């Protein structure tokens, strides 16, 4: 059973001011610590791609509603996708792409996990879209900056952080490393990075 979730447009709000040339992306799901659904991550990638092209945008500010930038992905939705190949194909933008019927690799196969993992490395998936953004990006970090939101901080040109901001990624606990760790280490040095993450 799939839970009711807000639309991508409700979770990822986008506004621009052509006069100042500043666009704002707001994560707006505070009751779930601004966790984006897979479709919201796709919208985020699309919005950044549009802002990258738009001559009326020179700077993008990224912020979260409530006390946190965000706690990472919508994990219940991700887990539902493990049993719903149609949801995975939709996330991969393959549900109706004009090439005919596509079957998602079955559970228990290497390709099942590798397919979604490879997709997450693609900027169109919304995980590293900010890394490919060619204009100025500023993230307002506060509260939890965890998982997917940690990526956004790592990929931004400038992070303005509150004193209570907590940076981290679940991979630190479960794998010993995390995507984008090298970005942070290069920017601030290993010791400062180790002090920063929780």
Where do the language-model regions lie?
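Crotonase-fold acyl-CoA enzyme core
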Residues: 128-198
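Catalytic-core regions built around general acid/base machinery
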Residues: 47-50, 122-134
């Amino acid at each position: 059973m799939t839970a009711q979730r807000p639309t991508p447009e409700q979770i990822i709000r986008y506004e621009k001011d052509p006069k100042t040339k500043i666009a704002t992306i707001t994560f707006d799901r505070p009751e779930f610590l601004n966790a984006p659904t897979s479709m919201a991550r796709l919208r985020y990638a699309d919005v950044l791609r549009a802002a990258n092209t738009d001559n009326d945008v020179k700077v993008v500010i990224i912020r979260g509603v409530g006390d946190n930038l965000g706690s990472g992905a919508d994990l219940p939705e991700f887990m539902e996708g493990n049993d719903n190949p149609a949801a995975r194909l939709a996330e991969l933008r393959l549900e109706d792409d004009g090439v005919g019927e596509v079957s998602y690799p079955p559970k228990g196969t290497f390709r099942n996990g590798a397919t979604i993992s490879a997709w997450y490395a693609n900027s169109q998936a919304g995980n590293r879209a900010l890394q490919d953004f060619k204009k100025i990006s500023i993230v307002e970090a506060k509260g939890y900056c965890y998982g997917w939101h940690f990526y956004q901080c790592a990929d931004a040109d400038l992070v303005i952080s509150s004193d209570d901001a907590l940076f981290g990624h679940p991979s630190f606990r479960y794998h010993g490393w995390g995507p984008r760790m090298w970005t942070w280490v290069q920017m601030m040095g290993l010791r400062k990075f180790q002090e920063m993450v929780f």
